[in-house]
Regions:
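Bacterial N-terminal signal peptides that target proteins for export
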Residues: 2-12
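N-terminal signal peptide c-region/cleavage motif recognized by signal peptidases
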Residues: 20-22
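Auxiliary, metal-adjacent structural segments of Zn-dependent hydrolase domains
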Residues: 24-61
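Active-site scaffold of zinc-dependent metalloenzymes
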Residues: 48-77, 88-91
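Active-site recognition of the HExxH zinc-binding catalytic motif
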Residues: 82-91, 101
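An active-site-proximal "capping" alpha-helix that borders the catalytic cofactor pocket
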Residues: 95-111
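Long, well-structured alpha-helical subdomains associated
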Residues: 113-152
Length: 152
């Protein structure tokens, strides 16, 4: 009977998760998501692919990371992993964008999937970004990223 309730609880959690997504979204429970054949995990966080998301990705603070599948599909693997790690980083360092950038950059550098040439692509992607209310300007972000990549 206990197993029945555990299974029912998982099904209800999945149903609640899917209610907040559109019909084109795909939800992946913890431990089931991969990028270009590389398994990706962020603790107990679900990944939700949504082609209509108005950003590359976002962490909702409720155990979900939403990713724009169209935008991600246009990026090389290392940049996909950066964005996923950046959003995952918000679960570890909070809402600070510079801290999430730094967390993702160091993770990629230390795990070996973010070599210097891939890091240069990231800097190019951000250098002319104007920023917004929540995100620093491109030059500020690039400066922070360079410090993170070169520091321990």
């Amino acid at each position: 009977m206990r197993a029945y309730y555990k299974h029912l609880k998982s099904l209800l959690a999945a149903a609640v998760l899917l209610v907040g997504t559109n019909t084109h979204s795909q939800a992946f429970p913890p431990g089931t998501f991969s990028v270009d054949g590389i398994p990706v995990a962020c603790g107990g966080v679900w990944f939700v692919l949504n082609p209509n998301l108005p950003d590359v990705g976002m962490a909702d603070g409720q155990g979900r990371i939403f990713l724009n599948s169209v935008v991600l599909g246009q990026l090389p693997t290392m940049l996909k992993l950066y964005w996923i790690s950046h959003e995952c980083g918000h679960y570890f360092v909070g809402s600070d964008e510079d801290a999430a950038d730094c967390w993702a950059i160091r993770l990629g550098r230390d795990q070996g999937w973010f070599p210097p040439e891939a890091f240069q692509l990231l800097l190019q992607m951000f250098q002319n970004n104007p920023g917004d209310v929540r995100h620093p300007s491109g030059p500020q972000r690039v400066s922070n990223m360079m410090q993170c990549y070169s520091s321990q």
